[in-house]
Every structure is written in structure tokens, then in C-alpha cells.
């Protein structure tokens, strides 16, 4: 059975698209047929992060408006088997995204036997965000450990509970998970960031992953590669743990405590 997962947030710049790409790639690595859809009409960042921007001929809106078939618009990832991308339009009006159009595309993808459909939502409550949430079975709320980011995530939780198809039909609600990004235990210790416990106390939803602040994320993005492919990076390992939890496996949370320096590192001040 296909699982439709929206990756969303109340605030921009929290690593939502990076997370969508990493989770989609990780699921495909596990043998799950996965497609990542960019709902951010007008910006189109997903294909850049996944390194396929030059291969975009048709997009999500072309399919909705009947200018192309889904098979024409879907891009197969060259690095990872089982991984596909449906890019957003960079030039179209955001209102070109319609509920009927999105439902048609999702229904067709389900018929194509995708195991996972990852919906990369724009931040906030614009049309793309509402439609990405509307059809979801599960939601990953991406937030930084900062008061403003957590507060905006709380607003998104309200939208998920009231504006989804599941809420309308009064059936099992969307499963909600917290993904905490750019976590820095040293700054938490200094009181410059909220702790994981603080965020959980505020949002009151299960946590699926904690992604540490890591310069490797920017390097991977600039190279058009998903960070999860960098197995030597802390962020890549944390995303891998997140994917395993999404598949029902238990993983302890790494990178949530300040790394203790060895004697030599303390001696030489490194």
C-alpha cells in the first residue's frame, strides 16, 4: 500500500527540501519505489538539490494541465535505483496547482505501484502547502530548535488536524512526526537553542529524527547530491537513522549530546 508523506514546516529555511530529498533517497536505497514531488511552484529547488535540473523538460503543472503525461514529466534518478522526481514549475502561477489536478496525479502514481510518495511542501500556508497536506497519510514536521520555528510548526499542526482529507472525512488522522534539523548540542548547552526535550514538550508529537548542524549538508547541496549519500557525514547518518525509523526499525538518537573531546584534542585545543 502506497504511503503518502508530506514534509512540511511553518517557516522557510529549516531544511525541508534537503530532508525530502534525503528521506526519498534513503527509502529508495532500502528497495522502496519512491517518488519525491516538488509542491513549491515558482521556486523549484528539489531538482537542484537532487542534481537533475538540466533534465527537466516537463513538470508537475504540465501534467495537471494536460500538456504532458506523468511518464513524460517524471525523472528517474541516475544515482539511486527506485528513486524518481516530479519537479515543480518555475514559471507558472501558484494557483495552477488544483485539488482535482493533484488528486489525479497521486491516483495515477498509486496505480504505478509506488511504495512512497514524498510531497515536498512549501513553507507556511500557501496553496501548495495546503494541497501537499490535504492528501497525506503521514506528515513530517521539520523544525529548527528555535522558538519562532517551533511556534510556526505548531500552527502547521493545527492545519494538518483541520484541513486534510482525513479530517474532512472524519477518518484516522494524519500520523505526525517531528524532524528536528540543524541541532547543535553545544549551543543547546549554552542556552542559545531549545533542547530536543523542550521542542517535544511544546509540540507533543513523536520524534522521527534529529539532524545535527553539519557543513556537509551545504557541500552536498552545491554538488547536487542528497546528503544521505555521504555516509561519512553526521547529517547523512542521522537521515539514515530517520529512514530506518520511518520503516518501523528502532534506532537510538545520535548527535544529541555534545561530543566529548579526546585528551589529545583538548591538549591541542582542537
From Swiss-Prot:
It comes from the Bacteria. GO terms for cellular component: cytoplasmic side of plasma membrane; cytosol. CDD domains: MinD. It is found in: Cell membrane. InterPro entries: AAA_dom, MinD, MinD_FleN, P-loop_NTPase, ParA/MinD_ATPase. ATP binds at residues 11-18. GO terms for biological process: division septum assembly; negative regulation of cell division. GO terms for molecular function: ATP binding; ATP hydrolysis activity. Pfam families: AAA_31. Keywords: ATP-binding, Cell cycle, Cell division, Cell membrane, Membrane, Nucleotide-binding, Septation. It is a peripheral membrane protein. Belongs to the ParA family. MinD subfamily. Interacts with MinC and FtsZ. ATPase required for the correct placement of the division site. Cell division inhibitors MinC and MinD act in concert to form an inhibitor capable of blocking formation of the polar Z ring septums. Rapidly oscillates between the poles of the cell to destabilize FtsZ filaments that have formed before they mature into polar Z rings. This is Septum site-determining protein MinD. It comes from Buchnera aphidicola subsp. Acyrthosiphon pisum (strain APS).
Amino acid at each position: 500500500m502506497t504511503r503518502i508523506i508530506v514534509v512540511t514546516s511553518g517557516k522557510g529555511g529549516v531544511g525541508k527540501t534537503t530532508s525530502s530529498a534525503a528521506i526519498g533517497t534513503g527509502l529508495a536505497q532500502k528497495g522502496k519505489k519512491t517518488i519525491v514531488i516538488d509542491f513549491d511552484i515558482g521556486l523549484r529547488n528539489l531538482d537542484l538539490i537532487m542534481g537533475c535540473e538540466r533534465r527537466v523538460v516537463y513538470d508537475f503543472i504540465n501534467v495537471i494541465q494536460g500538456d504532458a503525461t506523468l511518464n513524460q514529466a517524471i525523472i528517474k534518478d541516475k544515482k539511486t535505483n527506485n528513486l524518481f522526481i516530479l519537479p515543480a514549475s518555475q514559471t507558472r502561477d501558484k494557483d495552477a496547482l488544483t485539488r482535482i489536478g493533484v488528486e489525479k496525479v497521486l491516483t495515477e502514481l498509486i496505480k504505478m505501484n509506488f511504495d512512497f510518495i514524498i510531497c515536498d511542501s512549501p513553507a507556511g500556508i500557501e496553496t501548495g502547502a495546503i494541497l501537499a497536506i490535504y492528501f497525506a497519510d503521514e506528515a513530517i514536521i521539520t523544525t529548527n530548535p528555535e522558538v519562532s520555528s517551533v511556534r510556526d510548526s505548531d500552527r502547521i499542526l493545527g492545519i494538518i488536524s483541520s484541513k486534510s482529507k482525513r479530517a474532512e472525512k472524519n477518518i484516522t488522522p494524519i500520523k505526525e512526526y517531528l524532524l528536528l534539523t540543524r541541532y547543535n548540542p553545544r549551543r543547546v548547552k549554552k542556552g542559545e537553542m531549545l533542547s530536543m526535550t523542550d521542542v517535544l514538550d511544546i509540540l507533543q508529537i513523536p520524534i522521527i529524527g534529529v539532524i545535527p548542524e553539519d557543513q556537509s549538508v551545504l557541500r552536498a547541496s552545491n554538488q547536487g547530491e542528497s546528503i544521505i549519500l555521504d555516509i561519512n557525514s553526521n547529517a547523512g547518518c542521522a537521515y539514515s537513522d530517520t529512514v530506518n525509523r520511518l520503516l518501523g526499525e528502532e534506532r537510538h538518537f545520535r548527535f544529541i549530546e555534545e561530543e566529548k573531546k579526546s585528551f589529545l584534542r583538548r591538549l591541542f585545543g582542537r
